[in-house]
Amino acid sequence: MTDMRRLGQRAKQASLLIAPLSTQIKNRFLSTLAKALVDDTQTLLAANQKDLANAKEHGISDIMMDRLRLTSERIKAIAQGVQQVADLADPIGQVIKGYTNLDGLKILQKRVPLGVIAMIFESRPNVSVDAFSLAFKTNNAIILRGGKDALHSNKALVKLIRQSLEKSGITPDAVQLVEDPSHAVAEELMQATDYVDVLIPRGGAKLIQTVKEKAKVPVIETGVGNVHIYVDAQADLDMATNIVINAKTKRPSVCNAAEGLVIHEAVAARFIPMLEKAINQVQPVEWRADDKALPLFEQAVPAKAEDFETEFLDYIMSVKVVSSLEEAISWINQHTSHHSEAIITRDIKAAETFQDLVDAAAVYVNASTRFTDGFVFGLGAEIGISTQKMHARGPMDLEALTSTKFYINGDGHIRE
């Protein structure tokens, strides 16, 4: 029996053991875990330093190092996130509908756990805790497989969670970490249909594509953010400037950061110099511009076809000039990763058309795409941003980690 198979068996058994846990027990444990994270900050930072040292040795960029880095403040924020999950309403057992049918059967549809969730993710060690807390709150066991660059951090975090579970009298196998970073083991997890009920990949386009090609278990796609902002002919250009600066430069390494700028030709000659001057005062950006946009920049490079398909996660942005709203919508739908898209305009009809026709989980009017986030949407914590349409779409909250079951009660009923 392989290690992955043993891990899967333990996760399946754990899912049955935690399925009956009450809301009170779950919330009490999550509060305990939140405190333990803060109390054990120095141990977690020491583990993270090993990952940072390895990353530096391998020449990882400063932006990617930032994704990997833990600090006392970040650990405190992770702990606060766990407590916020404890404070959320528990969806498990919620009655969606109930009725008595014509045969006199009493029928209830309730929310129930999915069972075993597997998560494959990259870089950010906070995902270990975020994903566990959401899975635990919904009575799911979880198998975590992080990137090798965050292995020491993930091991320390999962060890702390397992110790806390054991001290609370709860099976520590409610969370398990795949420590082998090999692709073969990851592929085995993707195909563990006997044990895994759903797989959630969270990372870059290459990871998502690999999972889509290799997985045999059900998959919920998340994460890739080839996000666009369209500056319409009727845009407030000051507003557009502020929004683009925020969406591109505030945190370029996150999936809701803007990667592509689409501009109506009626305002391009005014807007591009205005934006370039303003953004250079905050954080210079490398512009990869099409033929119409290129001569309007003081400093830019010609865009290649692949630039319009790329999630840069850096201070780089593609630029496309279009002649109409319809062309903008068509261009975005051709290149979007279906995450978040935005239009800047004072034209109400254009805004409504854009929101109706752009194929993305979140579509903004006159706002930064950086708001696509479970907490910001008032949903509480999220396990990722789903970019597909089935089961869940957009920020995945607690309800997205549940299924439903019909409970039918009769009194000797038989069907004639």
Swiss-Prot record:
Record-level GO BP terms: L-proline biosynthetic process
Coiled-coil stretches noted in the UniProt entry, renumbered to this chain: none
Annotated keywords: Amino-acid biosynthesis, Cytoplasm, NADP, Oxidoreductase, Proline biosynthesis
Enzyme's top EC category: oxidoreductase
Pathway stated in the Swiss-Prot or TrEMBL entry: Amino-acid biosynthesis; L-proline biosynthesis; L-glutamate 5-semialdehyde from L-glutamate: step 2/2
Keyword Glycoprotein attributed: no
Annotated transmembrane regions: none
Keyword NADP belongs to the record: yes
Catalytically driven reaction(s): L-glutamate 5-semialdehyde + phosphate + NADP(+) = L-glutamyl 5-phosphate + NADPH + H(+)
EC numbers for this chain: 1.2.1.41
Subcellular location: Cytoplasm
Family annotation (InterPro entries): Ald_DH/histidinol_DH, Ald_DH_C, Ald_DH_N, Aldehyde_DH_dom, G-glutamylP_reductase_CS, Glu-5-SA_DH, GPR_dom
Any one GO molecular function term: glutamate-5-semialdehyde dehydrogenase activity
Function: Catalyzes the NADPH-dependent reduction of L-glutamate 5-phosphate into L-glutamate 5-semialdehyde and phosphate. The product spontaneously undergoes cyclization to form 1-pyrroline-5-carboxylate.
Record protein name field: Gamma-glutamyl phosphate reductase
